[in-house]
Amino acid sequence: MHKFDARPQAEYDRFMNESQQSISAIVLAGGQSRRMGRDKALIDYQGRPIIAHVVDTLRALSDDIAVVSNQSDLYGPFGARIVPDYEPPCGPLGGIAVGLQTARHPLAVVVACDMPFLNVTLLRWLIDLAEGYDAVVPQTGDEFEPLHAVYRRECYSPMVQRIERGERRVISFFADVRLRPVPEPEWRVLDPAGRSLVNLNTPDDLDLLSPPAYNR
């Protein structure tokens, strides 16, 4: 099992402050929220839209935050760059691709717009794991979590090649790059409850935003 960085805290903080200048962040907000029935990114959480919490969390990691969406009027006020979605639309794979294409730094954190409980420490650790790899992707059981991951800009071309072949699954390009899977027992050391990877897909999931749930 990968051990969490044991360097003295001051040295680790200094390392992360330097890293912030070389990390981009990409928020995927191009979905149609059909199962939710309304825009998931704008759902209220603690008095603010979820996407506002997401962007604020990412500010601790990056000086280059992009929201991938064709709705600049909705997401522009949250203080991130707005990047038009891939055309023709092809789901999250296209969103990640255009985000990487416009990223200002070689490495990017990618998250979905409906993840209210992002854990900065976990994301920093995933970034730290990226040395020598093109993609660092947590797993839940045997399933990858590609919308809470770290990718290099070099992933852009393999992604587009897969899209041009008709692929839509984000994981389709993993065989074409240097992949670092992160098994569940590893990342749960930093997030035992697994809250960071929670996203909201249906109205029933909104119960997770109630105080008894998010204070657990």
Regions found by a protein language model. Give the residues of each.
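Short, positively charged and aromatic/hydrophobic N-terminal segments
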Residues: 3, 12-14
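Nucleotide and nucleotide-moiety/phosphate-recognizing core
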Residues: 17-167, 172-194, 207-214
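Long hydrophobic alpha-helical segments typical of transmembrane helices together
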Residues: 202, 214-216
